[in-house]
C-alpha cells in the first residue's frame, strides 16, 4: 500500500 497526499491508504 501507499499513503497518498490526502492521507488515504491505497
Curated annotation (Swiss-Prot):
Binds 4 Cu cations per monomer. GO terms for molecular function: hydroquinone:oxygen oxidoreductase activity; metal ion binding. Its cofactor is Cu cation. It is found in: Secreted. Keywords: Copper, Lignin degradation, Metal-binding, Oxidoreductase, Secreted. Optimum pH is 4. Activity decreases at higher pH and is lost at pH 6. This is Laccase. One of its GO terms (cellular component) is extracellular region. Its EC number is 1.10.3.2. It catalyses: 4 hydroquinone + O2 = 4 benzosemiquinone + 2 H2O. Coiled coil: none annotated. Belongs to the multicopper oxidase family. Monomer. Optimum temperature is 60 degrees Celsius. After incubation at 80 degrees Celsius or 20 degrees Celsius for 5 minutes 50% activity remains. Activity is lost after incubation at 100 degrees Celsius for 5 minutes. After incubation at 60 degrees Celsius for 1 hour 18% activity remains.
Amino acid at each position: 500500500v501507499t499513503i497518498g497526499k490526502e492521507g488515504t491508504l491505497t
